[in-house]
A protein has these predicted regions:
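Residues forming the flavin
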Residues: 1-51, 57-163, 167-187, 191-534
Length: 534
């Protein structure tokens, strides 16, 4: 009998195999247990003196009669049944030309891959470079300050997530998540992402995975073009007929998936100019904070810090002001990672976080950000974009106009005293830092809320608010500052037919998995409407 067995717990105080723990949970001898497959694995650190690994598994168990009845009486044990995948009925309307996807981030890659698998021969257009060239350009920027507006942390194969921690978590509960994770594994991601409660691939594994997805699209009859910057849409009778590239080349398109990413500000401006439905939306801005990873490990795991089965600890922290108008929270926490320069425009400083798969840098970093909305940046579809740009340019100027970032030790920030770079970590941001009061590069309502929030976080995580941490600014690209309006069922733009806004850049996702899922659903919507390309 194949059983789904939840909450199989193994204490780190014990030396026990997973098979032994399953047998103990079920009350069966070892010889009655067949194959075991992990469905989910999580760390339960609620009791610092007895941290456990908690597994959900699928197991083949030789049982029947009374024993089977006894097992199934346990609320953690059920008889396993294969989940039925939703069927896809392909549409019948003919496409006037192959579909085009703008942007090779997670949303664009999945939108293209899904249609390639069903014979739609999509054309994927990426404004930046392939991963290998992009990595060289980014490394040059970090080492020398030589900025390339066409190839950077935001633009290029894989999107902004290529230089991140590679988190594959999401709050969206969708049965297609498992299928997407399997696609990632098939493309080169490690298999443990299929069951880890907090899966991540790291920037190093993610780069290989992205290349695998692009290759698969080409193998299935699609095509990928780099250095293909879409600067305009070919619109007739409020329907998109094609796209126009930088340089004037026109490409016909039977449908256009717009997965441009959250930093494609020139694309946003073009859409607004062309009358495409686009509105401002709230987002958040702030700083990156760096602590010794050992401090976070001790705060989260106590005496088990450093245990080989735990890895580098993460955290998620939230603080609401007394009047409930502002929230400070950690975002995109990168255990064992580094702070990176993430500008996409000349003359602006942007910071982000990144980790390798092993998360072994010895430094924990996270964004600490505060919510902003129209009361802060005003009216207008692109008001949020201008708000971001203003503080990025302030940071650039304050740090010496060289892509150095303004930074301040936590103690001086909390005390509003003379800023310094003295801290307990070796600062990881490159090309370098300039000691600067962060009050000069962020609005007062952000820095004031951060001070309150960090003080609160220190009561939740031991040592968090003590001296020794470093703050680096500015973090402005937490999510898209706009939403490109679309129909909830058909995914089509509310103003222009055959245009399908998609992913994080369109305001419908926040992270690799939710963006990939949105690309998946947009692709299905197009396939349910149109027939494959002949």
């Amino acid at each position: 009998m194949k059983l789904k067995i939840n909450n199989v717990r193994i204490s780190l105080r014990q030396e026990q195999t997973l098979e032994q723990a399953v047998c103990r949970k079920c009350g069966i001898p070892r010889e009655a247990l067949g194959s075991v497959r992990i469905v989910r694995k999580a760390v339960d650190a609620r009791k610092k003196n007895d941290i456990c690994l908690n597994y959900h598994v699928l197991a083949e168990v030789e049982t029947g009669g009374r024993q089977a009845k006894r097992l199934l009486a346990d609320r953690d044990i059920t008889q396993y049944q294969e989940q039925q995948q939703p069927t896809l009925e392909l549409g019948t309307l003919p496409l006037s030309a192959p579909p085009v996807v703008i942007g090779a981030g997670p949303a664009g890659l999945l939108a293209a891959l899904q249609r390639a698998e069903h014979g739609y021969k999509p054309l994927l257009l990426e404004r930046g470079k392939p991963v290998a060239q992009r990595v060289q350009d980014v490394q040059r920027f970090w080492q020398t300050g030589e900025f390339n507006p066409a190839s950077n942390v935001q633009f290029g194969e894989g999107g902004a997530g290529t230089f991140s921690d590679g988190k594959l978590t999401t709050r969206v509960n969708d049965p297609m998540m498992a299928e997407i994770l399997q696609l990632f594994v098939d493309a080169g991601a490690p298999e443990n992402i299929l069951y880890e409660h907090k899966p991540h691939v790291g920037t190093d594994k993610l780069r290989a995975m992205v290349q695998g997805l692009s290759r698969r699209i080409a193998e299935l009859g699609g095509s990928v073009r780099y250095d293909a910057h879409v600067v305009d849409l070919d619109i007739k009778n409020n329907a998109v007929q094609g796209v126009i590239l930088d340089g004037g080349e026109r490409l016909a398109a039977g449908a256009v998936v717009l997965a441009c990413g959250h930093s494609a500000r020139d694309t946003y401006a073009m859409l607004a100019r062309r009358g495409v439905g686009i509105v401002a939306k709230p987002f958040a801005i702030g700083v990156r904070i760096e602590h010794p990873q050992e401090l976070i490990d001790r705060a989260q795991y106590g005496s088990f810090a450093g245990h080989h089965l735990l890895g580098a600890a993460d955290y998620a922290l939230v603080y609401h002001t007394q009047d409930k108008t502002r929230t400070a929270y950690s975002f995109c926490m990168c255990p064992g990672g580094q702070v990176v320069a993430a500008a996409s425009e000349a003359g602006g400083v942007v910071v982000n976080g990144m980790s390798m798969f092993k998360r072994d840098s010895g430094i924990a970093n996270s964004a600490l950000v505060v919510n902003v909305d129209s009361r802060d940046f005003g009216d207008g579809a692109l008001a949020g974009v201008e708000f971001q740009r203003r503080y990025e340019q302030l940071a650039y100027a304050a740090a010496g106009s060289s892509y150095y970032a303004p930074a301040q030790d936590l103690d001086s920030f909390l005390k509003r005293s003379t800023p310094s770079l003295e801290c307990l970590v070796q600062p990881s941001y490159r090309p370098g830092l300039t000691a600067c009061s962060l009050d000069k590069v962020l609005p007062a309502y952000v820095t004031d809320t951060l001070r309150e929030g960090i003080t609160s976080f220190g009561r939740k995580l031991a040592g968090y608010a003590d001296g020794g941490a470093l703050l680096t600014g500015v973090e402005t690209r937490t999510s898209a500052p706009v939403r490109i309006e679309r129909d909830r069922q058909s995914y089509v733009s509310l103003t222009h037919d055959l245009l399908y806004p998609c992913g994080e850049g369109a305001g419908y996702a926040g992270g690799i998995m939710s963006a990939a899922l949105d690309g998946y659903h947009v692709a299905r919507a197009i396939m349910e409407r149109f027939a494959p390309v002949k």
